[in-house]
Swiss-Prot record:
Organism: Oryza sativa subsp. japonica
CDD domains: chitinase_GH19 (cd00325), ChtBD1 (cd00035)
Upper lineage: Eukaryota, Viridiplantae, Streptophyta, Embryophyta, Tracheophyta
Residue intervals of the Chitin-binding type-1 domain: 30-64
Protein name as it appears in the record: Chitinase 5
Expressed in which tissues: Expressed in sheaths and meristems and at lower levels in roots and leaves.
Any single GO BP term: cell wall macromolecule catabolic process
Record's keyword annotation contains Disulfide bond: yes
Catalytic center residues: E151 (proton donor)
Pfam families: Chitin_bind_1, Glyco_hydro_19
């Protein structure tokens, strides 16, 4: 028939459709803008679960292991995708043990926290120290371990001192309700606390944080994963504002604005020391 499309016309139509879809995909990826607890998938859409946080995840609490689309949001897991430094090359055995060896003998954490457990956890959060410049990446690693050092006493403590006697249950939080007999005191490298942190952290990592919070003090990889989960959701995005912004994100209500200058100074000194070890300037806005 005279009005039937020819093979050549069909080919041009198919090519045009492919280009349109490609452009749409790129535009949505560039403007993902997900909430902090959601992942930006390799196709540029927000959500949770392996379809969004797995292979090719661009930003957010990515599972890692991907190697898909790099760029501004985080790139692939492990050694592929994204910019920044290799975390493994910065966090050497000498650096990690240099912190831990300052803890007194007999500390529970000395036989719990290991460099390998940290690296295993870091592979699940591909945006950590991987989506910015080399110097920015080193500063982020220095900041993370400065807070870990302060929170755990050079990796001495796994559990918060006298934590079991504290009440970290927000009964008004209906999404992550406290479970009978369970305590949500500080555990792990960043001493994650409160039911509203244990619940979503466990959901993201793959354990029941509300019913089994002690898991954070029993499995060193899960322990580091909870720290990195908290970091990526609460601290990573303010890192470029300076180390002081990270203090405010972690414990600002109790330390900033002159409330505990000794704690602030300790965190800053650890950070400056680790930046020196990494050969990078610590930048400005160090205090809060």
């Amino acid at each position: 028939m005279a009005n039937s499309p020819t093979p050549t016309m069909l080919a041009f139509l198919a090519l045009g459709l492919a280009l349109l879809l490609s452009a749409t995909g790129q535009a949505s990826a560039q403007n993902c803008g997900c909430q902090s607890n959601m992942c930006c998938s390799k196709w540029g859409y927000c959500g949770t679960g392996k379809d969004y946080c797995g292979d090719g995840c661009r930003s957010g609490p990515c599972y890692g292991g991907g190697g898909g689309g790099g760029g501004g949001g985080g790139g692939g897991g492990g050694g592929g995708g994204g910019s920044g430094v290799s975390v493994e090359s910065v966090v050497t055995e000498a650096f990690f043990n240099g912190i831990k060896n300052q803890a007194p003998n007999g500390c529970a954490g000395k036989n719990f926290y290991t460099r390998q457990s940290f690296l295993n956890a870091a592979h699940s959060y591909s945006g950590f120290a991987r989506d910015r410049t080399n110097d920015d990446s080193k500063r982020e690693i220095a900041a993370f371990f400065a807070h870990v050092t302060h929170e755990t006493g050079h990796m001495c403590y796994i559990n918060e001192i006298n934590g079991a006697s504290m009440d970290y249950c927000d009964k008004n939080n209906k999404q992550w309700p406290c479970q009978p007999g369970k305590k949500y005191y500080g555990r792990g490298p960043l001493q994650i606390s409160w039911n509203y942190n244990y619940g979503p952290a466990g959901q993201n990592i793959g354990f029941d944080g509300l019913r089994d919070p002690d898991r954070v003090a029993q499995d060193p990889t899960i322990s580091f994963k909870t720290a990195l989960w908290f970091w990526m959701n609460n601290v990573h995005q303010v890192m470029l504002q300076g180390f002081g912004a990270t203090i405010r994100a972690i414990n600002g209500a109790l330390e900033c604005n002159g409330k505990n200058p000794g704690a602030v100074n300790a965190r800053v000194n650890y950070y400056k020391d680790y930046c020196r070890q990494f050969g990078v300037d610590p930048g400005g806005n160090l205090y809060c």
